[in-house]
Design a protein with these regions (language model features):
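Short internal alpha-helix immediately C-terminal to a glycine-rich phosphate-binding loop
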Residues: 1-10, 21, 102-113, 217-220
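A short, small-residue-rich loop immediately preceding and capping a beta-strand
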Residues: 6-41, 113-126, 210, 231-235
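Alpha-helix C-terminal capping segments
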Residues: 1-5, 22-34, 53, 131-138, ...
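Active-site/ligand-binding loops adjacent to catalytic centers
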Residues: 71-72, 82, 135-209, 224
Length: 242
Protein backbone atom coordinates (compact mmCIF):
# COMPACT_ATOMS: atom_id res chain seq x y z
CA UNK A 1 0.00 0.00 0.00
CA UNK A 2 2.98 2.34 0.60
CA UNK A 3 3.81 2.06 -3.14
CA UNK A 4 0.23 2.90 -4.10
CA UNK A 5 -0.48 -0.50 -5.62
CA UNK A 6 -3.00 -1.55 -2.95
CA UNK A 7 -6.18 0.45 -2.38
CA UNK A 8 -7.68 0.90 1.11
CA UNK A 9 -9.81 -2.11 1.98
CA UNK A 10 -8.83 -3.98 -1.18
CA UNK A 11 -8.73 -7.77 -0.94
CA UNK A 12 -5.27 -9.33 -0.90
CA UNK A 13 -4.81 -12.69 -2.64
CA UNK A 14 -1.83 -15.00 -2.19
CA UNK A 15 -0.94 -18.62 -2.94
CA UNK A 16 0.73 -19.61 0.32
CA UNK A 17 0.32 -21.76 3.42
CA UNK A 18 3.69 -21.27 5.14
CA UNK A 19 5.15 -18.71 7.52
CA UNK A 20 4.58 -15.94 4.97
CA UNK A 21 0.87 -16.76 4.96
CA UNK A 22 0.80 -16.37 8.75
CA UNK A 23 2.60 -13.02 8.64
CA UNK A 24 0.39 -11.84 5.78
CA UNK A 25 -2.78 -12.80 7.66
CA UNK A 26 -1.68 -10.79 10.68
CA UNK A 27 -0.69 -7.80 8.55
CA UNK A 28 -3.97 -7.84 6.61
CA UNK A 29 -5.98 -8.08 9.81
CA UNK A 30 -4.21 -5.07 11.28
CA UNK A 31 -4.53 -3.01 8.09
CA UNK A 32 -8.16 -4.02 7.43
CA UNK A 33 -7.55 -5.78 4.13
CA UNK A 34 -9.55 -8.98 3.51
CA UNK A 35 -7.22 -11.88 2.70
CA UNK A 36 -7.75 -14.92 0.50
CA UNK A 37 -5.12 -17.66 0.78
CA UNK A 38 -5.04 -20.34 -1.91
CA UNK A 39 -3.33 -23.64 -1.17
CA UNK A 40 -3.40 -27.37 -1.97
CA UNK A 41 -6.05 -29.43 -0.19
CA UNK A 42 -3.22 -31.49 1.29
CA UNK A 43 -2.16 -28.66 3.62
CA UNK A 44 -2.72 -29.94 7.19
CA UNK A 45 -6.14 -29.12 8.64
CA UNK A 46 -4.48 -27.58 11.69
CA UNK A 47 -2.67 -25.09 9.46
CA UNK A 48 -5.87 -24.22 7.59
CA UNK A 49 -7.74 -23.65 10.87
CA UNK A 50 -4.94 -21.51 12.26
CA UNK A 51 -4.90 -19.26 9.19
CA UNK A 52 -8.69 -19.01 9.28
CA UNK A 53 -8.53 -17.93 12.92
CA UNK A 54 -6.18 -15.14 11.85
CA UNK A 55 -8.91 -13.88 9.51
CA UNK A 56 -7.96 -15.41 6.17
CA UNK A 57 -10.42 -17.06 3.81
CA UNK A 58 -9.01 -20.39 2.66
CA UNK A 59 -9.44 -21.59 -0.93
CA UNK A 60 -8.26 -25.12 -1.69
CA UNK A 61 -6.98 -26.68 -4.88
CA UNK A 62 -6.68 -30.37 -5.73
CA UNK A 63 -3.04 -31.37 -5.20
CA UNK A 64 -2.86 -33.25 -8.50
CA UNK A 65 -2.92 -29.89 -10.33
CA UNK A 66 0.18 -28.72 -8.46
CA UNK A 67 1.24 -25.11 -8.30
CA UNK A 68 -0.67 -24.29 -11.48
CA UNK A 69 -3.89 -25.36 -9.79
CA UNK A 70 -3.22 -23.12 -6.80
CA UNK A 71 -2.35 -20.16 -9.02
CA UNK A 72 -5.51 -20.74 -11.05
CA UNK A 73 -7.54 -20.51 -7.83
CA UNK A 74 -5.69 -17.32 -6.95
CA UNK A 75 -6.46 -15.70 -10.31
CA UNK A 76 -10.11 -16.74 -10.01
CA UNK A 77 -10.20 -15.01 -6.62
CA UNK A 78 -8.59 -11.89 -8.10
CA UNK A 79 -11.12 -11.76 -10.96
CA UNK A 80 -14.04 -12.34 -8.59
CA UNK A 81 -13.09 -9.83 -5.90
CA UNK A 82 -10.93 -7.32 -7.75
CA UNK A 83 -8.18 -8.29 -5.34
CA UNK A 84 -4.44 -7.71 -5.50
CA UNK A 85 -2.24 -10.76 -6.11
CA UNK A 86 1.10 -10.47 -4.33
CA UNK A 87 2.71 -13.46 -6.09
CA UNK A 88 5.55 -13.55 -3.59
CA UNK A 89 7.21 -16.48 -5.41
CA UNK A 90 8.20 -14.00 -8.14
CA UNK A 91 7.92 -10.66 -6.31
CA UNK A 92 11.39 -9.14 -5.81
CA UNK A 93 10.22 -7.37 -2.65
CA UNK A 94 10.46 -10.82 -1.05
CA UNK A 95 14.25 -11.38 -1.35
CA UNK A 96 14.87 -7.63 -1.12
CA UNK A 97 13.48 -7.60 2.43
CA UNK A 98 15.92 -10.32 3.44
CA UNK A 99 18.79 -8.51 1.73
CA UNK A 100 17.97 -5.38 3.74
CA UNK A 101 16.83 -6.84 7.06
CA UNK A 102 17.40 -10.55 7.74
CA UNK A 103 20.84 -10.86 6.18
CA UNK A 104 22.34 -7.82 7.93
CA UNK A 105 20.79 -8.91 11.24
CA UNK A 106 22.44 -12.33 10.96
CA UNK A 107 25.87 -10.91 10.14
CA UNK A 108 25.67 -8.36 12.98
CA UNK A 109 24.40 -10.83 15.57
CA UNK A 110 27.16 -13.34 14.83
CA UNK A 111 29.97 -10.83 14.15
CA UNK A 112 30.39 -12.72 10.91
CA UNK A 113 31.68 -15.79 12.73
CA UNK A 114 29.83 -18.35 10.62
CA UNK A 115 30.71 -21.46 8.68
CA UNK A 116 27.25 -22.05 7.20
CA UNK A 117 23.69 -20.74 7.11
CA UNK A 118 20.89 -23.29 6.70
CA UNK A 119 17.63 -22.05 5.17
CA UNK A 120 14.42 -23.81 4.16
CA UNK A 121 13.18 -23.01 0.66
CA UNK A 122 9.56 -22.24 -0.09
CA UNK A 123 9.32 -19.10 -2.20
CA UNK A 124 13.10 -18.82 -2.34
CA UNK A 125 13.08 -15.27 -0.99
CA UNK A 126 14.79 -15.95 2.32
CA UNK A 127 17.62 -18.11 1.01
CA UNK A 128 18.26 -15.70 -1.86
CA UNK A 129 18.17 -12.49 0.15
CA UNK A 130 20.10 -13.85 3.13
CA UNK A 131 22.53 -15.73 0.91
CA UNK A 132 23.33 -12.80 -1.36
CA UNK A 133 23.96 -10.46 1.56
CA UNK A 134 25.93 -12.99 3.60
CA UNK A 135 28.22 -13.93 0.73
CA UNK A 136 28.87 -10.26 -0.06
CA UNK A 137 30.26 -9.80 3.46
CA UNK A 138 31.42 -13.33 4.25
CA UNK A 139 32.79 -14.89 1.05
CA UNK A 140 33.66 -18.19 2.75
CA UNK A 141 30.26 -18.83 4.35
CA UNK A 142 28.30 -21.75 2.91
CA UNK A 143 24.60 -21.39 2.11
CA UNK A 144 22.63 -24.61 2.57
CA UNK A 145 19.14 -24.90 1.08
CA UNK A 146 16.61 -27.33 2.57
CA UNK A 147 13.72 -29.00 0.75
CA UNK A 148 11.41 -31.95 1.49
CA UNK A 149 12.75 -35.39 0.60
CA UNK A 150 9.39 -36.10 -1.05
CA UNK A 151 9.55 -33.03 -3.28
CA UNK A 152 13.05 -32.33 -4.60
CA UNK A 153 12.47 -29.71 -7.29
CA UNK A 154 15.61 -27.77 -6.37
CA UNK A 155 17.73 -30.88 -6.87
CA UNK A 156 16.02 -31.73 -10.14
CA UNK A 157 14.41 -34.81 -8.63
CA UNK A 158 10.92 -36.20 -8.09
CA UNK A 159 8.24 -33.86 -6.75
CA UNK A 160 5.29 -35.16 -4.77
CA UNK A 161 3.14 -34.70 -1.69
CA UNK A 162 4.86 -33.86 1.60
CA UNK A 163 3.91 -32.62 5.07
CA UNK A 164 6.24 -29.67 5.59
CA UNK A 165 4.08 -26.55 5.05
CA UNK A 166 6.06 -23.63 3.69
CA UNK A 167 8.71 -25.73 1.94
CA UNK A 168 8.84 -27.59 -1.36
CA UNK A 169 6.42 -25.85 -3.72
CA UNK A 170 7.03 -28.55 -6.33
CA UNK A 171 8.88 -26.24 -8.73
CA UNK A 172 11.88 -23.91 -8.69
CA UNK A 173 10.64 -20.42 -7.70
CA UNK A 174 11.65 -17.36 -9.71
CA UNK A 175 13.02 -15.80 -6.52
CA UNK A 176 15.43 -18.70 -5.95
CA UNK A 177 19.04 -17.87 -6.83
CA UNK A 178 20.87 -21.20 -7.27
CA UNK A 179 24.24 -19.49 -7.73
CA UNK A 180 24.56 -18.56 -4.05
CA UNK A 181 23.52 -22.01 -2.78
CA UNK A 182 26.44 -24.32 -2.02
CA UNK A 183 24.46 -27.44 -1.14
CA UNK A 184 20.90 -28.76 -0.97
CA UNK A 185 19.75 -31.14 1.76
CA UNK A 186 16.46 -33.05 1.48
CA UNK A 187 14.67 -33.94 4.72
CA UNK A 188 11.75 -36.42 5.02
CA UNK A 189 8.49 -34.98 6.37
CA UNK A 190 8.42 -37.44 9.27
CA UNK A 191 11.91 -36.36 10.39
CA UNK A 192 11.01 -32.68 10.07
CA UNK A 193 7.91 -33.03 12.24
CA UNK A 194 9.70 -35.18 14.82
CA UNK A 195 12.59 -32.72 15.09
CA UNK A 196 10.19 -29.79 15.50
CA UNK A 197 8.48 -31.58 18.39
CA UNK A 198 11.86 -32.37 19.92
CA UNK A 199 12.84 -28.70 19.75
CA UNK A 200 9.64 -27.77 21.57
CA UNK A 201 10.14 -30.34 24.32
CA UNK A 202 13.86 -29.78 24.88
CA UNK A 203 14.25 -26.03 24.29
CA UNK A 204 10.67 -24.69 24.53
CA UNK A 205 10.95 -23.34 20.98
CA UNK A 206 7.61 -23.79 19.15
CA UNK A 207 9.14 -24.46 15.75
CA UNK A 208 7.10 -25.40 12.71
CA UNK A 209 7.82 -28.55 10.68
CA UNK A 210 9.80 -26.38 8.27
CA UNK A 211 11.93 -25.30 11.21
CA UNK A 212 12.36 -28.94 12.15
CA UNK A 213 13.54 -29.67 8.61
CA UNK A 214 16.14 -26.90 8.83
CA UNK A 215 17.45 -28.16 12.18
CA UNK A 216 17.58 -31.74 10.90
CA UNK A 217 19.52 -30.57 7.85
CA UNK A 218 21.96 -28.66 10.07
CA UNK A 219 22.58 -31.79 12.12
CA UNK A 220 23.27 -33.76 8.96
CA UNK A 221 25.60 -31.03 7.70
CA UNK A 222 27.60 -30.96 10.94
CA UNK A 223 27.85 -34.75 10.92
CA UNK A 224 29.09 -34.82 7.34
CA UNK A 225 31.30 -31.75 7.78
CA UNK A 226 32.61 -31.79 11.39
CA UNK A 227 34.80 -28.77 10.64
CA UNK A 228 31.59 -26.72 10.47
CA UNK A 229 31.18 -25.77 14.13
CA UNK A 230 29.39 -22.44 13.60
CA UNK A 231 26.13 -23.16 11.80
CA UNK A 232 23.13 -20.83 11.91
CA UNK A 233 19.60 -22.09 11.24
CA UNK A 234 16.89 -19.77 9.94
CA UNK A 235 13.73 -21.14 11.56
CA UNK A 236 10.43 -19.68 10.38
CA UNK A 237 6.87 -20.25 11.57
CA UNK A 238 5.34 -21.66 14.72
CA UNK A 239 4.08 -25.04 15.87
CA UNK A 240 1.47 -26.51 13.53
CA UNK A 241 2.09 -30.24 13.13
CA UNK A 242 0.62 -32.80 10.78
Amino acid sequence: SERGELSPGQTVVEASSGSFAVALAIACSRSHHPLILCMPATVPTERQKYLSQLGAKIVLSNYVYGRKGVEKRAMEAVNKTGGYYLNYFANDLNPEFHRRVTGPAIVRATDGQLDAIVVGVGSGGTVTGVGEYAKAWLPDVKIIAVEPYESQALSGGYTGHHNIPGLGAGFVPENYNPYIVDSIIAVPSSHANATARELLYTDAIPASPSGGAVLMAARQLMTDRPEFSRVLCVIAGKTVYE
